[in-house]
């Protein structure tokens, strides 16, 4: 890496030059540097709204970059800058390699953006059902033996998609999967929404590009310090960059936010220059928090002790995932208590676990406050866990492709009456955004009970036409 070159931030520098010129705007956006919306300017600040500008020659154009945006992408190792979140990056990957009828091998515990891409392009999923840790109620990684079996049984598949890592920090044998897939001429796509730091920290699981994957969708905003909704799509050698750009432009906005673009540019510079040091501190804070939480009693903050060489090939130690059923509370209940009673906002709570996202903006005093609150919750709210559900993953039975089911003729039924039917829509807790049900899957009584239980516990649910999640669209 050329550290001298990495000190540059071309988009940020161009915006600074633009700001100093005091250009009179007769273009969009219509707030005209905030003058037309003083309440917005007061909320965000005049400098912020003053830099919310449209594409122009001095600032380049994301859809066809030739100057400062192109320079920024080159400094990010030929990455595509994305302003539609990692959702758009994941969909860009899949649409770049899959066409209607193509098979793609992937774990079922993927983010909804991956299955949405299958709805758009008509590709057919070949699911490698992940192993499940029944004690923790979480799905694990892709066992390489199952991946090998799927590749052997589906030699016509065009790609394999891998989570690296999962939301909970679980990593599969990415290098091994890449080797197997490439031997059969398949592309390897990595959803690294939760893996930005893998490119900068020491002692962390291998990142997708180093493992030889063909493409990786990376959420710079999650752990890299850029603004929400900003992301990157990385390409390895052998991918046609011009074709991928065309695919991205099918769905990406033509009005890219320069606030998002400049945040990617600045964050890339910061991580290139100081990322190793910054994430070294993150690892220390996460390990400290894990040890402190485990000393409380009742909780289990898991880490590398889960590694088994197969379904948990490695573990991302920056992830502070905590099992809560030991104190008789669902993860979502602890999540709500932390926010409502202690003014602590963590990433998510599910049926069995919580996740506190630790990154470059955290301080040790924040960690102490979280640990203290969890100790308080254990002391004040602990109860018997009898009767609580422990499963987080339900293996699906796929009857038809997501696209076919999504566009099929459907009817709305009360959830309690849908067992045995084929789902025509998604149901998921968000976060993490992993579908409990996806279009084309059979609804079982177990799934119905799980959805009702998750609702009862207060999980934030989405995906259905019915905003109350009381009815489901099923195929006629």
Place the predicted regions along the sequence by residue.
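N-terminal glycine-rich, Lys/His-bearing helix-loop that initiates the first secondary-structure elements
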Residues: 1-52, 432, 464-465, 470-476
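Conserved PLP-enzyme active-site core in the AAT-like
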Residues: 8-16, 64, 71, 84-305
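Conserved N-terminal alpha-helix of the aminotransferase class I/II PLP-enzyme fold
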Residues: 48-88
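Gly-rich Lys/Arg/Thr-decorated short loops/hinges at beta-loop-alpha junctions or inter-strand turns
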Residues: 50-59, 75, 125-135, 316-317
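Short glycine-rich or small-residue beta-strand-to-loop segments that form or flank ligand, phosphate
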Residues: 59, 80-82, 160-163, 321, ...
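Generic structural signal for residues in well-ordered beta-strands
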Residues: 79-80, 125, 346, 472
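Short, compositionally biased
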Residues: 122, 127, 456-467
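Conserved C-terminal alpha-helix-loop-beta "cap" of PLP-dependent enzymes
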Residues: 288-463
């Amino acid at each position: 890496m050329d550290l001298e070159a990495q000190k540059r931030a071309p988009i940020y520098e161009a915006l600074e030059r633009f700001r100093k010129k005091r250009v009179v705007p007769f273009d969009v956006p219509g707030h005209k540097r905030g003058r037309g919306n003083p309440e917005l300017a007061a909320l965000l600040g005049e400098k912020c709204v003053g830099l919310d500008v449209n594409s122009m020659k001095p600032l380049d154009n994301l859809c066809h970059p030739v100057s400062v945006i192109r320079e920024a992408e080159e400094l990010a190792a030929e990455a595509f800058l994305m302003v539609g979140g990692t959702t758009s990056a994941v969909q860009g990957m899949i649409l770049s390699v899959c066409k209607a009828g193509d098979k793609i091998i992937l774990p079922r515990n993927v983010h909804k953006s991956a299955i949405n891409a299958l709805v758009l392009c008509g590709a057919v999923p070949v699911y490698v059902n992940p192993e499940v840790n029944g004690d923790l109620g979480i799905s694990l990684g892709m066992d390489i033996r199952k991946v090998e079996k799927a590749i052997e049984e589906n030699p016509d598949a065009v790609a394999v998609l891998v989570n690296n890592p999962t939301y909970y920090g679980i990593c599969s044998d990415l290098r091994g999967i890449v080797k197997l897939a490439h031997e059969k001429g398949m592309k390897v796509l990595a959803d690294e929404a939760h893996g930005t730091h893998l490119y900068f920290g020491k002692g962390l699981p291998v990142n997708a590009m180093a493992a030889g994957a063909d493409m990786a969708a990376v959420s710079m905003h999650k752990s890299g310090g850029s603004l929400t909704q900003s992301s990157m799509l990385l390409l390895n050698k052998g991918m046609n960059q011009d074709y991928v750009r065309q695919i991205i432009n099918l769905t990406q906005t033509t009005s890219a936010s320069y606030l998002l673009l400049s945040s990617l540019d600045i964050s890339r510079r910061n991580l290139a220059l100081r990322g190793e040091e910054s994430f070294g501190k993150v690892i220390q804070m996460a390990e400290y928090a894990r040890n402190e939480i485990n000393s409380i009693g009742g909780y289990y903050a898991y880490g590398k002790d889960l590694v088994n060489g197969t379904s948990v090939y490695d573990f991302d130690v920056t992830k502070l995932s905590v099992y809560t059923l030991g104190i008789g509370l669902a993860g979502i209940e602890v999540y709500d208590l932390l926010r409502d009673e202690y003014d602590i906002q963590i990433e998510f709570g599910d049926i069995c676990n919580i996740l506190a996202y630790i990154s470059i903006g955290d301080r040790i005093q924040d960690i102490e406050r979280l640990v203290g609150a969890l100790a308080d919750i254990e002391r004040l709210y602990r109860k018997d866990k009898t009767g609580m559900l422990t499963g987080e993953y339900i293996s699906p039975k796929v009857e038809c492709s997501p696209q076919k089911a999504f566009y099929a003729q459907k009817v709305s039924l009360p959830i309690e009456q849908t067992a045995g039917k084929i789902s025509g829509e998604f149901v998921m807790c968000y976060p993490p955004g992993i579908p409990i049900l996806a279009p084309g899957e059979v609804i079982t009584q177990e799934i119905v009970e799980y959805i009702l239980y998750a609702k009862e516990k207060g999980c934030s649910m989405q995906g259905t036409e019915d905003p109350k999640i009381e009815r489901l669209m099923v195929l006629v």
